[in-house]
């Protein structure tokens, strides 16, 4: 599609509350790698980072949403409106958009933070008021159209909003960047949502169809009580579940699971597997090294694993662990990592051979 905009004062990225420094560090690093100057504006616990850059529209496609680890959503900021009149918030936004092209959709949002969550009612009501005003001005299609840029209004308080634009092909397809997943009653643990979200977020739809096929063979390292194993069985995979602890009986009853009582950190298969998944609580560098060994030895073709991050210097540790993994894997791999909504102080990594 055509560029979402020729202008922009910066990038607005949403994140998990408390991880603003990590996202700021990542944006600064990746923008520098791409040859763009800029600086991050943020405060801890805001749930967002504003990366100021005079060339934001050109920078945005260089920082692909799927490649950003700590960003739940990535938007190009058209304008910041810090002193809105509660009696008329619409007119300043229409003024800002006077020369803008038509948009295919409108999302009115807020950060997922202590200060942002109370704004959900305002966001919903304001969206209902702004949509007809935009359509009357010829700025919004009657029905959602993903071939056109998407307009975002992000409130950070009742009188302070960012007017932004996103490329639907290079941004999260969910409001606030949060996929709405439901924990089914039969899920052995809430960790099942992490793997569900990883498959949804880290793989494109066509990749999921090609790489997660029924009948594939997988290993789940540190499997108990069976949350990730259960997700794999729902993909109709045959799973070796490695853990000295017990699995839930209904997971075993699927007929697709073999439970091996062993230390998941040291076990390896006799024959190569299609998939390996791992959500073990261990130092991230040790996990990165062990995951690299799996690829170097040819024990799996694809993997999804979690890296538990330390309390300090989490962006530095993330870079170190991912570099360590790729250096030691012994083969070229596509590596994608995200701090998922259902992650906590951790990131989830996908590794797969280059196609």
Swiss-Prot record:
Asked if the record carries the keyword Transferase, the reply is yes
- Gene3D superfamilies in UniProt: 3.30.2300.20, 3.30.70.2810, Vaccinia Virus protein VP39
Q: Which GO terms describe its molecular function?
A: S-adenosylmethionine-dependent methyltransferase activity
Q: Which reaction does it catalyse?
A: cytidine(2498) in 23S rRNA + S-adenosyl-L-methionine = 2'-O-methylcytidine(2498) in 23S rRNA + S-adenosyl-L-homocysteine + H(+)
Q: Where in the cell is it found?
A: Cytoplasm
Q: Does the keyword S-adenosyl-L-methionine apply?
A: yes
Record-annotated residues binding S-adenosyl-L-methionine?
A: 191, 224-227, 243, 263, 279
Q: What's the Enzyme Commission number for this chain? A: 2.1.1.186
Active site per UniProt = 308 (proton acceptor)
Q: Fetch the InterPro entries from UniProt.
A: RlmM_FDX, RlmM_THUMP-like, RNA_MeTrfase_FtsJ_dom, rRNA_MeTrfase_M, SAM-dependent_MTases_sf
Entry GO CC: cytoplasm
* Keyword field: Cytoplasm, Methyltransferase, rRNA processing, S-adenosyl-L-methionine, Transferase
Query: In its UniProt record, which GO terms are filed under biological process?
Result: methylation; rRNA processing
The lineage's top-level taxon is: Bacteria
Pfam families in the cross-refs:
FtsJ, RlmM_FDX, RLMM_N
| Function of the protein | Catalyzes the 2'-O-methylation at nucleotide C2498 in 23S rRNA.
Name the NCBIfam families on file: PRK11760.1
Family annotation (HAMAP family): 23SrRNA_methyltr_M (MF_01551)
What family does this belong to?
Belongs to the class I-like SAM-binding methyltransferase superfamily. RNA methyltransferase RlmE family. RlmM subfamily.
Summarize subunit and interaction data from the UniProt record for this chain.
Monomer.
Q: What is this protein called?
A: Ribosomal RNA large subunit methyltransferase M
**Source organism per UniProt:** Stenotrophomonas maltophilia (strain K279a)
């Amino acid at each position: 599609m055509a560029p979402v905009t020729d202008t922009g004062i910066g990038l607005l990225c949403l994140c998990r509350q408390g991880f603003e420094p990590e996202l700021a560090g990542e944006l600064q690093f990746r923008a520098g790698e791409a040859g763009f100057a800029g600086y991050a504006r943020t405060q801890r616990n805001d749930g967002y980072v504003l990366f100021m850059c005079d060339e934001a529209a050109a920078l945005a496609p260089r920082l692909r949403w799927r490649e950003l680890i700590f960003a739940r959503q990535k938007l190009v900021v058209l304008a910041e409106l810090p002193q809105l009149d509660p009696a008329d918030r619409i007119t300043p936004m229409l003024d800002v958009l006077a020369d803008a092209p038509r948009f295919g959709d409108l999302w009115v949002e807020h950060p997922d933070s202590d200060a942002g969550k109370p704004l959900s009612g305002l966001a919903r009501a304001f969206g209902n008021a702004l949509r007809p005003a935009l359509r009357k001005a010829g700025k919004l299609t009657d029905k959602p159209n993903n071939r056109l840029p998407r307009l975002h209004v992000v409130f950070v308080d009742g009188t302070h909003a960012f007017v932004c634009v996103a490329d639907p092909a290079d941004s999260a397809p969910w409001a606030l960047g949060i996929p709405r997943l439901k924990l089914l009653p039969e899920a052995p643990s809430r960790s099942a949502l992490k793997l569900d979200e990883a498959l949804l977020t880290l793989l494109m739809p066509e990749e999921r169809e090609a790489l997660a096929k029924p009948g594939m063979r997988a290993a789940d390292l540190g499997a108990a009580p069976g949350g990730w194993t259960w997700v794999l069985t729902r993909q109709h995979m045959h799973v070796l579940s490695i853990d000295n602890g017990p699995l839930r009986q209904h997971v075993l009853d699927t007929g697709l699971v073999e439970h091996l009582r062993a230390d998941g950190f040291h076990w390896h298969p006799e024959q190569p597997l299609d998939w390996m998944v791992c959500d073990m609580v261990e130092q991230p560098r040790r996990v990165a090294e062990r995951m690299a060994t799996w690829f170097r030895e040819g024990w799996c073709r694809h993997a999804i694993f979690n890296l538990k991050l330390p309390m300090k210097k989490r962006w530095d540790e993330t870079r170190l662990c991912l570099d360590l993994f790729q250096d030691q894997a012994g083969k070229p791999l596509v590596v994608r990592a995200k701090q998922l909504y259902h992650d906590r102080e951790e990131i989830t990594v996908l590794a797969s051979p280059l196609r």
